[in-house]
């Protein structure tokens, strides 16, 4: 009978410790709006999409001169290889 009470006491002690530790850890964690981490990228009209938060938790400084990592380029440029691949320009006549 003594071992039965001891095993129940062990479960009660573990339960009390979990009830004490779990709320303390929740109160110390800050929401994403406070830490500055973003889940989505930032769209810039002339520059594509800038990637969101980095794995280290330090988001890049965003200003007008910062272009970040480009995920999408929104402008088409002519080929520099001169090998074609596009349409021939139509003659005006």
Swiss-Prot record:
Cellular compartments per GO CC: apoplast; plasma membrane
Source organism per UniProt: Arabidopsis thaliana
Motif (SCOOP motif 2): 73-87
Composition bias type Polar residues, residue spans: 53-66
Subcellular location: Cell membrane; Secreted, Extracellular space, Apoplast
Tissue: Mostly expressed in seedlings shoots, and, to a lower extent, in roots.
Name of this chain's protein: Serine rich endogenous peptide 6
Alphabetic keyword roster: Apoplast, Cell membrane, Cleavage on pair of basic residues, Membrane, Repeat, Secreted, Signal
Family recorded in the similarity comment: Belongs to the serine rich endogenous peptide (SCOOP) phytocytokine family.
GO molecular function, one term: receptor serine/threonine kinase binding
Job description of the protein: Brassicaceae-specific phytocytokine (plant endogenous peptide released into the apoplast) perceived by MIK2 in a BAK1/SERK3 and SERK4 coreceptors-dependent manner, that modulates various physiological and antimicrobial processes including growth prevention and reactive oxygen species (ROS) response regulation. Inhibits root growth.
Intervals of motif SxS motif essential for MIK2 binding: 54-56, 79-81
GO BP annotations, alphabetical order: response to herbivore; response to insect; response to wounding
Residues making up the signal peptide according to the UniProt record: 1-27
Main location: membrane
Quaternary structure annotation from Swiss-Prot or TrEMBL: Interacts with MIK2 (via extracellular leucine-rich repeat domain); this interaction triggers the formation of complex between MIK2 and the BAK1/SERK3 and SERK4 coreceptors, and subsequent BAK1 activation by phosphorylation.
Motif (SCOOP motif 1): 48-62
Induction: Accumulates upon infection by generalist herbivores such as Spodoptera littoralis. Induced by wounding.
Residues in coiled coil: none
Spans annotated as Disordered: 52-93
């Amino acid at each position: 009978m003594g071992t039965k009470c001891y095993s129940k006491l062990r479960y009660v002690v573990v339960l009390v410790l979990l009830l004490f530790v779990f709320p303390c850890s929740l109160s110390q964690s800050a929401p994403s709006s406070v830490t500055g981490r973003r889940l989505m990228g930032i769209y810039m009209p002339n520059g594509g999409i800038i990637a969101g938060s980095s794995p280290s938790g330090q988001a890049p400084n965003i200003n007008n001169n910062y272009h970040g990592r480009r995920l999408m380029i929104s402008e088409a440029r002519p080929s520099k290889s001169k090998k074609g691949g596009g349409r021939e320009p139509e003659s005006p006549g």
